UniProtKB/Swiss-Prot annotation:
<dbReference type="GO" id="GO:0005829">
    <property type="term" value="C:cytosol"/>
</dbReference>
<protein>
    <recommendedName>
        <fullName>Proline--tRNA ligase</fullName>
        <ecNumber>6.1.1.15</ecNumber>
    </recommendedName>
</protein>
<keyword id="KW-0067">ATP-binding</keyword>
<dbReference type="InterPro" id="IPR004500">
    <property type="entry name" value="Pro-tRNA-synth_IIa_bac-type"/>
</dbReference>
<dbReference type="InterPro" id="IPR006195">
    <property type="entry name" value="aa-tRNA-synth_II"/>
</dbReference>
<dbReference type="InterPro" id="IPR004154">
    <property type="entry name" value="Anticodon-bd"/>
</dbReference>
<dbReference type="InterPro" id="IPR002316">
    <property type="entry name" value="Pro-tRNA-ligase_IIa"/>
</dbReference>
<dbReference type="Pfam" id="PF00587">
    <property type="entry name" value="tRNA-synt_2b"/>
</dbReference>
<dbReference type="GO" id="GO:0016740">
    <property type="term" value="F:transferase activity"/>
</dbReference>
<dbReference type="Pfam" id="PF04073">
    <property type="entry name" value="tRNA_edit"/>
</dbReference>
<keyword id="KW-0963">Cytoplasm</keyword>
<keyword id="KW-0436">Ligase</keyword>
<dbReference type="InterPro" id="IPR002314">
    <property type="entry name" value="aa-tRNA-synt_IIb"/>
</dbReference>
<comment type="subunit">
    <text>Homodimer.</text>
</comment>
<dbReference type="GO" id="GO:0004827">
    <property type="term" value="F:proline-tRNA ligase activity"/>
</dbReference>
<dbReference type="GO" id="GO:0002161">
    <property type="term" value="F:aminoacyl-tRNA deacylase activity"/>
</dbReference>
<dbReference type="InterPro" id="IPR001387">
    <property type="entry name" value="Cro/C1-type_HTH"/>
</dbReference>
Length: 567
């Protein structure tokens, strides 16, 4: 394709709010254009890359007998009310109302709709298992869209849904999909690591995320260097081994702590290590207030709280609620209280006595507080985030951290949706049973961004061969010169029969063409320049920067060999 005919609006400067390198490069190279916050158009080069990504996805889905369908993005509220997610999903669900007053949502996911499609059709165990997938735009009303395609309000996803008669069948499809995802990310050029994860608003009993390693990733991966252990930090279990630091029990004292609001400020004020301070936070669990205690250097993990209490209906109490409940602001909370409120403490609080806690009075704290004498803990548990260097639950070593971009996730849903939506089948005994489900997502547009995030240098994008918008970049330095133009035209006609060629025939300065070529990042470049009359051209590899002069008689062989050896 001739570059003069392709819409590639490259930029010299990008908006300052473009934080991620992938966002900057996708804008700068003319692949995407922002419409409004979190919403982008995919221009010709990006569309070609997306087509290559989705072709790989379709191949791998067909390989495991997943059948493609296409469902509407617009979903009626009644389906979401059946599953209970209309109210539970929260403000990220894009809701709208038609002229007749009916409520709809622009789907962020399609569990309800696909369940409604199959519930009257998959009637017998003989029809199972069945796996359906689609590739479609999804919508999420992000509070703060950022990082370009990584966290947008409209995005492209591949979502698949499987239906089973028993858990063994679900296990097999889950493993098939897990392996397919591993192949997909390897084929598109992403270093992605599967990690144990939380199922979030989708629900289910078991899930893995596929994380593309990246410094700008919004998720923290906990992993072992001694085993294949990897988990999202939200799910990484903290191993508790008692290490009591009990000293002689002291008398409780109330001390004045003016303008002290954080654990670190309190530790500095008292001249004590922050891990000897105990923080108190108040949560509402299904409408009931509870206190949760952790040591000063630890952070409460609300995902673990949701898992522990078996509900998603958990939220941190507001400042007004806290003041009304205990008469003090959040920085002064403590477990010594004369109100009926259950107290839960992280396991590691057990290692201390003579605790330092808030006095439930602004400007004051209590020292030498002891469990059993001054207050009681209802239950201990793992309620916090793991720290780097702590022991891992698989006994393989210690926790190491890396940042990652979630590009895919696989879920075992069980009967969460089929039971609430009455999707049943007859088993081999003729008894009605709820369909057992799995769901599996890949962020297609996120994958595009993650590829760029992992495959670039200071000059621009470096496309992997499998997804590159074009295979070769043919550049005529000066098309006004007959020998250069004629040779470039001839090479374009020859190579375009075997490769996808982007032919830069523009009347632009050589520097502009080279800068754009580096920015766009096609794997191989053929430059027709001043030695055109001799039949000599330059061949350059984008990844390594290696270049050589080649006679046109040898050019097809050289290019074919280099292309075959590309990653």
């Amino acid at each position: 394709m001739k570059q003069s005919k392709v819409f590639i609006p490259t930029m010299r400067d990008v908006p300052s709010e473009a934080e991620a390198q992938s966002h900057r490069l996708l804008l700068k190279s003319g692949l995407i254009k922002q419409s409004t916050s979190g919403i982008y158009s995919y221009l010709p080069l990006a569309t070609r890359v997306l087509n290559n990504i989705t072709a790989i996805v379709r191949q791998e889905m067909e390989r495991i007998d997943s059948v493609e369908i296409l469902m509407p993005a617009l979903q009626q509220a009644e389906l979401w009310e059946e599953s209970g997610r209309w109210g539970a999903y929260g403000t990220e669900l894009m809701r709208l109302q038609d002229r007749h007053g009916r409520q709809f949502a622009l789907g962020p996911t399609h569990e309800e709709l696909v369940t409604s499609i199959v519930r009257n059709e998959l009637k017998s165990y003989k029809q199972l298992p069945m796996t359906l997938f689609q590739i479609q735009s999804k919508f999420r009303d992000e509070k703060r869209p950022r990082f370009g395609l990584l966290r947008g309000r409209e995005f492209i996803m591949k979502d698949a849904y499987s239906f089973h008669a028993d858990e063994a069948s679900l296990d097999q499809t889950y493993q098939d999909m897990y392996q397919a995802y591993s192949r997909i990310f390897e084929r598109v050029g992403i270093n992605a690591r599967p990690v144990v994860a939380d199922s979030g608003a989708i629900g289910g009993s078991h899930t893995h995320e596929f994380m593309a390693l990246s410094a700008i990733g919004e998720d923290t991966i906990v992993y072992s260097k001694e085993s294949d252990y990897a988990a999202n930090i939200e799910k990484a279990e903290v191993v508790y081994e008692p290490n009591h630091k009990h000293t002689t029990v002291q008398s409780l004292e109330k001390i004045e702590t003016p303008n002290v609001k954080t654990a670190q400020e309190l530790a500095d004020f008292l001249g004590r290590p922050v891990d000897e301070i105990v923080k108190t936070m108040i949560f509402k669990v299904d409408g009931e207030y509870i206190m949760v205690l952790v040591r000063g250097h630890h952070e409460i993990n609300d995902i673990k709280l949701k898992s522990y209490f078996g509900t998603d209906n958990i939220e941190l109490a507001t400042q007004d609620e806290i003041v009304n409940l205990v008469g003090a602001n959040p920085g002064s909370l403590g477990p010594v209280i004369d109100k009926e409120i259950k107290i839960y403490a992280d396991n590691f609080v057990q290692d201390l006595n003579n605790l330092v806690v808030g006095a439930n009075e602004d400007g004051y704290h209590l020292i030498n507080v002891n469990v059993g004498r001054d207050f009681n803990v209802d239950e201990y548990g793992d309620f916090r985030f793991i720290l780097e260097g702590e022991k891992l639950s698989d006994s393989s070593g210690v926790a190491h951290f890396a940042e990652g971009i979630e590009v895919g996730q696989v879920f075992k849903l069980g009967t969460k949706y089929s039971e609430s939506m009455n999707a049943t089948f007859l088993d081999n005994q003729g008894k009605a049973q709820p369909l057992i489900m799995g769901c599996y997502g890949i962020g297609i547009s996120r994958t595009l961004s993650a590829i760029v995030e992992q495959n670039h240098d200071d000059n621009g994008i470096v496309w992997p061969k499998s997804v590159t918008p074009f295979d070769l970049h043919l550049i005529s330095i000066n098309p006004k010169k007959d020998d250069q133009r004629e040779l470039a035209d001839a090479l374009y006609a020859e190579f375009n029969t075997k490769f996808d060629v982007l032919y830069d025939d523009r009347q632009e300065r050589a520097g502009v063409k080279f800068n754009d070529a580096d920015l766009i990042g096609l794997p191989l470049r053929i430059v027709v320049g001043k030695r055109a009359s001799e039949g000599i051209v330059e061949v350059k590899e984008r990844l390594t920067g290696d270049s050589e002069e080649v006679h046109i008689a040898d050019l097809m062989t050289v290019i074919t060999n280099k292309y075959d050896n590309l990653k």
